Amino acid sequence: MTDVTIRELASLAELRDSEDLQRAVWGQDDPADNADLMLAIQHEGGLVAGAFAEDRMLAFLFAFPSALPGVQHSHRLAVLPEARGLRLGSRLKWFQRDWCLAKGITLVRWTYDPIRAINAGLNVRVLGGTSGTYLENYYGTMEGINAGLPSDRLMLDWQLDSPAVVARATGRPVPRIAETRRLPIPADIDGLLLTDPAAALTARMDLRRDLVEAFAAGERIIGFDSTAPAYHLAKSQPGG
């Protein structure tokens, strides 16, 4: 494939192209973020970026300022199915990190579905995000690829200047925490949802119970094992 360029979207036409990309990833029934709204947010300090092979957009990221100084909310990250395997999701996130740090933003937050192993692998294992906040049925009933289960989410904290994130960004060894415990999740929740919807719902509710209890007890997600999918949890450190 032609070399891929990561950059901010530069026109209303590109923003409209991102609507098509969103539908290709999440399904035609899932409402895409509107180009006009993204344009206004971009002009007010938001980030709308894409991964391009020549003039074709292969992946897309949308983030906007939060109510807290130095904190950004990252709302969308989408990669076309045929472009998966090119690490475009992680490349866009590292682009986002550089963009944020240049503007004095040191914390990025976003929600993701904790039962999707591929998302946990990117958000926690690759990027170094952590979480101690569980949001039950956050978006209500959803359509597209998110249909069929309660829309539970984790609020992920990506502390851009933390030792764990800096190590990942620079290719250095990641600091290890000695005492952790594992919490397994399904390897393929989408496949399970197709073959055994009742088992998929049970897996969702079991994970909800386990994470809500863990967070209430002062534990926090600090790692993820992609080979045998499982979260690593540890007690929150003072001030952390």
Predicted feature descriptions by range:
Residues 6-81, 222-227:
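A conserved beta-strand-loop-helix scaffold within acyl/acetyltransferase catalytic domains
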Residues 11-24, 165-181:
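A short, well-structured alpha-helix characteristic of acyl/acetyltransferase catalytic modules
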Residues 70-81, 181-188, 192-195:
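Conserved acetyl-CoA binding element of GNAT-fold acetyltransferases
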Residues 80-91, 103:
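Conserved glycine-rich acetyl-CoA-binding loop
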Residues 100-113:
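Conserved GNAT acetyl-CoA-binding A-motif
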Residues 111, 121, 128-146:
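Conserved catalytic-core motifs of GNAT/GCN5-like acyltransferases
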Residues 137-169, 235-239:
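C-terminal "cap" of GNAT-fold acetyltransferases
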Residues 197-216:
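A conserved acidic, glycine/proline-rich C-terminal tail/linker
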